[in-house]
A protein has these predicted regions:
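Short beta-strand/loop motif that positions the catalytic acidic residue
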Residues: 189, 195-197
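An N-terminal hydrophobic leader/cap segment in hydrolases
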Residues: 4-42, 49-52, 154
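C-terminal catalytic histidine-bearing segment of alpha/beta-hydrolase fold enzymes
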Residues: 216, 221-265
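Gly/Ala-rich beta-loop-alpha elbow adjacent to hydrolase catalytic centers
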Residues: 151-155, 159
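Acidic catalytic loop of the alpha/beta-hydrolase fold
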Residues: 200-205, 232
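Serine-hydrolase catalytic machinery in alpha/beta-hydrolase-like enzymes
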Residues: 30-33, 39-138, 236-240
């Protein structure tokens, strides 16, 4: 029994280490970036939201994209994704939705703990945090007044919901997140919603027909694209050193589509 416990403990430690080190490549890319990154504290009500901001190196004022992170929290990949948005010419603002007194994503001991905490976040709190980020964006001197939202995984679902919450958005980019459940979830959407989905992500893919129906019935613009052979999380997985060919192709193709859509802001 002692040997079995030891082996189990080693396996858990190895898994935890793998999880911790899995985004070292993203951290390394971010550290090489020439762009300006900064942390700001966004205060609203009794909350202070730790927020990561990246600025593009451009001559003119730029649109702002609010980034809603995955269910794992504000990871190195999420920060690197924000930097990539800035490289494309956009100001990226990423609130750490796990912010709490004395805590943020980095405070959680492992991925499972972060997932559990995020899953318990009230939608009203999430939208209030995003509102604080949107208000901050509106005050930024280098911003041109155009605001969009994007989200990934859990954040993709929240991006869809935030489009219904904030009528000032110019666009919403939903990456493999669940869609609306009822008609009331889309009635206030005033911007186009663009979806990015993996063919091998049946859990989310199964929701697309219902989302299409709800959006069409409400007269809203919803344009989903499904990427062949890609799984859930392909924007992150497709950029990793060990990316599968399908995820890598989906990542690259989605980025090209996304950049073309961003130019409409």
């Amino acid at each position: 029994m002692k040997l079995r416990a030891l082996v189990f403990g080693l396996l858990v430690a190895a898994f935890s280490m793998g999880t911790t080190l899995a985004q070292d490549w993203a951290k390394a890319q971010l550290e090489k970036s020439p762009r300006h990154h900064e942390w700001v504290d966004l205060k609203h009500g009794n909350r202070t939201v730790k927020t990561f901001v990246v600025y593009p190196e451009v001559k003119t004022k730029a649109p702002v994209v609010l980034v809603i992170h995955e269910i794992f929290g504000l990871t190195d990949w999420a920060k690197n994704l924000a930097d990539e948005l800035a490289a494309a010419g956009y100001i990226a603002i990423v609130p750490d939705l796990l912010s709490a007194p004395g805590k943020d994503t980095s405070s959680y001991p492992d991925q499972d703990a972060a997932v559990k905490a995020i899953s318990a976040l009230p939608a009203a709190q999430v939208f209030a945090d995003l509102d604080a980020a949107a208000e901050y964006a509106a005050r930024l001197p280098p911003g041109n007044g155009s605001l969009a939202v994007t989200g990934f995984c859990w954040g993709g679902g929240k991006a869809f919901g935030y489009a219904n919450h904030n009528p000032k958005l110019k666009a919403a980019y939903v990456f493999y997140g669940p869609g609306p459940e009822i008609a009331a979830d889309v009635t206030k959407i005033a911007c186009p919603v663009y979806g990015f989905y993996g063919e091998d992500d049946a859990r989310i893919g199964a929701t697309i027909p219902k989302t299409k129906g709800i959006m069409q019935a409400a007269g809203k613009t919803y344009e989903p694209v499904i990427y062949p052979g890609a799984g859930h999380g392909f924007m992150r997985a497709g950029e990793a050193p060990d990316a599968s060919e399908a995820n890598r192709k989906a990542h690259d193709s989605a980025w090209e589509r996304w950049k073309a859509l961003l130019k409409k802001l």
